[in-house]
């Protein structure tokens, strides 16, 4: 289409277009993602020609508490307010989110039933859900032709009642919780989730949540990670594991590497009080050792034991307080403990050797006495026969 240049006078005047403007509902997802500047338009008033208000709007503004009609857009001049009103509006604007109703002064007065409208405003939640859809911003009605207040109130009331009926027909389970952005109920997304994974129980420390777009995911609070699939749904068993379905014991998992079995999935986090005993106990097979195991030599056999430690090992217990053990280093104490064990083993070895020598002496004496008795018996027999 061919466009013609506009003069400065035409540009400065707001365009008055015949017809009725219909507000397009914004998606809740886009409303949460867009900043308040894009949603509600600029808040700085522009210097334009002042439109003469009609008599009905003037009468309505005079009867109210200083609230301006909503069909005046941001193209008007700044409204004169008291300093107290300006401070109150600024505090509300800074403390509340941009999509919530600031105060009772910001609620449009053109609605036919103000009490029912305020009741619906209370449904506005943290994420800007169904309650905020009944609030009309001022900049939407820019350039709209002025009509008597009675006609606008009737049309707005019909529009509000229509949306109110739609909101009542919506299932309550489709709304989001007030505690989070992406937390929704499980009943509203039953057709989007996998019924096979819902039957499986979640391991301890796991929970289910949904994204803003309604996709289900799982949260592992033990490792602070998220996963798209159920932790027990995927059969990605570690190497050496096998899943066994038994009619007697049920379903359990066998670890062929460590020769053990358990009911808990190997990928699930281990909680001692929830772990059940394994149904099968492995009998380890005795394997023949072809090669002898090399044991390292004890370093204390060749170490030189200090004289004071030998004296301490033979001294009575009542003299233990003489040594100041707190002055020794931890590594030195470990070394001296090993040396004391070596002295103890040597003492035991000496005692065993002494007892063994005494036993050998007893056995030798018994053998000698037996031989003597036999010799005396033989000599006595020879004497008696002769």
UniProtKB/Swiss-Prot annotation:
Q: Identify the PANTHER family for this entry.
A: PROTEIN SALVADOR HOMOLOG 1, SALVADOR FAMILY WW DOMAIN-CONTAINING PROTEIN 1
Q: Which InterPro entries match?
A: SARAH_dom, Sav, WW_dom, WW_dom_sf
Which Gene3D superfamilies does the record associate with it?
A: 2.20.70.10
Q: Which molecular function GO terms apply here?
A: identical protein binding; molecular adaptor activity; protein serine/threonine kinase activator activity; transcription regulator activator activity
Quaternary context: Homodimer. Stabilized through interaction with STK3/MST2 or STK4/MST1. Interacts (via SARAH domain) with isoform 1 of NEK2. Interacts with ESR1 only in the presence of STK3/MST2. Interacts with WTIP and AJUBA.
Q: Which PROSITE patterns match?
A: SARAH, WW_DOMAIN_2
Q: Which residues carry this modification: Phosphothreonine?
A: 211
Reading the lineage from the top rank, the first entry is Eukaryota
Domain WW: residue ranges: 200-233, 235-268
List UniProt keywords, sorted A-Z. Coiled coil, Cytoplasm, Nucleus, Phosphoprotein, Repeat
Please name the gene that encodes this protein: Sav1
Q: Spell out which residues are annotated as carrying Phosphoserine.
A: 95, 137
Q: Which residues form a coiled coil?
A: 345-374
**Protein name per Swiss-Prot or TrEMBL:** Protein salvador homolog 1
Organism expressing this protein natively: Mus musculus (Mouse)
GO BP terms in the entry: cardiac muscle cell proliferation; epithelial cell proliferation; hair follicle development; hippo signaling; intestinal epithelial cell differentiation; keratinocyte apoptotic process; keratinocyte differentiation; lung epithelial cell differentiation
Q: What is its main location?
A: nucleus
This protein's GO cellular component annotations are: cytoplasm; cytosol; nucleus
Concerning PTM, the database record says: Phosphorylated by STK3/MST2 and STK4/MST1. Phosphorylation is not required for SAV1 stability and may increase the number of protein binding sites on the scaffold molecule.
SMART domains from the xrefs? WW (SM00456)
Annotated localization: Nucleus; Cytoplasm
Using the record's annotation, list all stretches that form the SARAH domain: 322-369
Function field = Regulator of STK3/MST2 and STK4/MST1 in the Hippo signaling pathway which plays a pivotal role in organ size control and tumor suppression by restricting proliferation and promoting apoptosis. The core of this pathway is composed of a kinase cascade wherein STK3/MST2 and STK4/MST1, in complex with its regulatory protein SAV1, phosphorylates and activates LATS1/2 in complex with its regulatory protein MOB1, which in turn phosphorylates and inactivates YAP1 oncoprotein and WWTR1/TAZ.
Null allele phenotype? Mice show progressive hepatomegaly with a 2-fold increase in liver mass relative to total body mass at 1 month of age and a 3-fold increase by 3 months of age. Embryos display unchecked proliferation and defects in terminal differentiation of epithelial cells.
């Amino acid at each position: 289409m061919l466009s013609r240049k506009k003069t400065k006078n035409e540009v400065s005047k707001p365009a008055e277009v015949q017809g009725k403007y219909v507000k397009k509902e914004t998606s809740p997802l886009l409303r949460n993602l867009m900043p308040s500047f894009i949603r509600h338009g600029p808040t700085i008033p522009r210097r334009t020609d002042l439109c003469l208000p009609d008599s009905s709007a003037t009468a309505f503004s005079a009867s109210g508490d200083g609230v301006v009609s909503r069909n005046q857009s941001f193209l008007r001049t700044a409204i004169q307010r008291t300093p107290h009103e300006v401070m109150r509006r600024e505090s509300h604007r800074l403390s509340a989110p941009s999509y919530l109703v600031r105060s009772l002064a910001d609620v449009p007065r053109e609605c036919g039933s103000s009490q029912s409208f305020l009741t619906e405003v209370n449904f506005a939640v943290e994420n800007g859900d169904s309650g905020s859809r009944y609030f009309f911003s001022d900049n939407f009605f820019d350039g709209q032709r002025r009509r008597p207040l009675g006609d606008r109130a009737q049309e707005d009331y019909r529009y509000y009642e229509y949306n109110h009926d739609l909101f009542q027909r919506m299932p309550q389970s489709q709304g989001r919780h007030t505690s989070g952005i992406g937390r929704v109920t499980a009943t509203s997304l039953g057709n989007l989730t996998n019924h096979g994974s819902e039957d499986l129980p979640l391991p301890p420390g796991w929970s289910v949540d949904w994204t803003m777009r309604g996709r289900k995911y799982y949260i592992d609070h033990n490792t602070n990670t998220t996963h798209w699939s159920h932790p027990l749904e995927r059969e990605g068993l570690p190497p050496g594991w096998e899943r066994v379905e038994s009619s007697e014991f049920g379903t359990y998992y066998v670890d062929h590497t460590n020769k053990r079995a358990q009911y808990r999935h190997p990928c699930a986090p281990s909680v001692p009080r929830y772990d059940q005993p394994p149904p099968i106990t492995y009998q380890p097979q005795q394997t023949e050792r072809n090669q002898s195991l090399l044991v390292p030599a004890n370093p204390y056999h060749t170490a030189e034991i200090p004289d004071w430690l030998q004296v301490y090992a033979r001294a009575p217990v009542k003299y233990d307080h003489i040594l100041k053990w707190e002055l020794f280093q931890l590594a030195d104490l470990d070394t001296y403990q090993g040396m004391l064990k070596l002295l103890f083993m040597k003492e035991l070895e000496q005692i065993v050797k002494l007892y063994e020598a005494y036993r050998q002496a007893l056995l030798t004496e018994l053998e000698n006495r037996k031989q003597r008795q036999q010799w005396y018996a033989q000599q006595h027999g020879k004497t008696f026969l002769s």
